[in-house]
Design a protein with these regions (language model features):
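Conserved alpha/beta core of the MobA/IspD/sugar-nucleotide pyrophosphorylase nucleotidyltransferase superfamily
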Residues: 1, 5, 191-236
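N-terminal glycine-rich phosphate-binding loop and ensuing alpha1 helix
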Residues: 2-59
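Short aromatic/basic micro-patch
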Residues: 24, 144, 183-184, 215, ...
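Acidic donor-binding segment of Leloir-type glycosyltransferases
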Residues: 42-91
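Residues at the starts of beta-strands that form the adenosine-phosphate
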Residues: 47-50, 134, 212
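Short beta->alpha connector loops at strand-helix junctions that form conserved
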Residues: 91-98, 216-217
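Conserved beta-loop-beta/alpha segment of the NTase-like Rossmann-fold superfamily
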Residues: 96-191
Length: 236
């Protein structure tokens, strides 16, 4: 099973007052927290690849371990990202259209690997091998989602998929019955995801197929919190 983890790091941060992805949460920029945990999981699971989608060139360069990066970026984590990038399992996708809504980021993440040009040197790869069997969407403004939860969710959904190969499962991390991110989609739903427009996200597709949805419950509600305002970050 080939699993593509699409890391959505392209939002406009309208309510935050500045680019929240670069806002420091603890000792790191917000976007790096979950990306580094996801990279650690991918290092252990060779079936995973990570596609980072952003409209911000600096973020994409840092994501793959290039450029000076933030001074707080631990060398071991930066090196891990660089090694994954060097092996073709972590790659950046420049998506200026993402400013028009999340559907553009979703589309860019799914189509990554197509031989399209990019204004950033070295940021376009021709994906080797077959297309992904699964797309899992992560959001970069969810800095408290743990590495353990990421790995457990992916293992849970691999088991679900393996038990019934005729089904087309969708998976969602939830807390107290409330769905959150990340969300797992069988490639069966690829065309529906590509058909999204504007600021409509993958939850729209999920809600159309609730009979196929498997929820993975976490105990800590904080893991699923995202940060939309400075008050969110300060209060959490």
């Amino acid at each position: 099973m080939k699993i593509r983890c699409v890391y959505l790091a392209a939002g406009n941060s309208r309510r935050f007052g500045k680019n929240k992805l670069f806002h420091m949460v603890g000792q790191k920029p917000m976007y790096l927290h979950l990306l580094d945990r996801l990279a650690a999981v991918a290092e252990r699971h060779k079936e995973l690849e990570i596609v980072v989608v952003s409209q911000y060139e600096e973020l994409l360069q840092e994501a793959v371990g290039e450029g000076p990066g933030p001074v707080c970026d631990p060398s071991v984590e930066k090196e891990r990202r660089a090694l994954l990038a060097g092996s073709g399992r972590l790659y950046p996708v420049y998506s200026p259209q993402s400013r028009e809504g999340v559907s553009h980021s979703i589309r860019a993440g799914i189509l990554a690997g197509m031989p399209e040009s990019s204004p950033i040197s070295g940021m376009c790869r021709q994906e080797a091998g077959r297309e992904p069997d699964v797309y899992v969407f992560f959001v970069a403004d969810q800095p408290w989602l743990s590495e353990r939860t990421v790995e457990a969710f992916l293992e849970f959904m691999k088991k679900v998929s393996g038990e019934d190969r005729e089904s087309h499962p969708i998976g969602c991390v939830s807390c107290l019955g409330e769905p959150g991110n990340p969300v797992w989609f069988s490639a069966f739903y690829k065309d529906e995801l590509l058909a999204l427009s504007g600021d409509r996200g993958g939850k729209r597709v999920m809600k159309a197929h609730m009979d196929q949805v498997h929820f993975f419950e976490v105990e800590e509600e904080r893991e699923l919190w995202d940060v939309d305002t400075l008050e969110d970050q300060a209060g959490r």
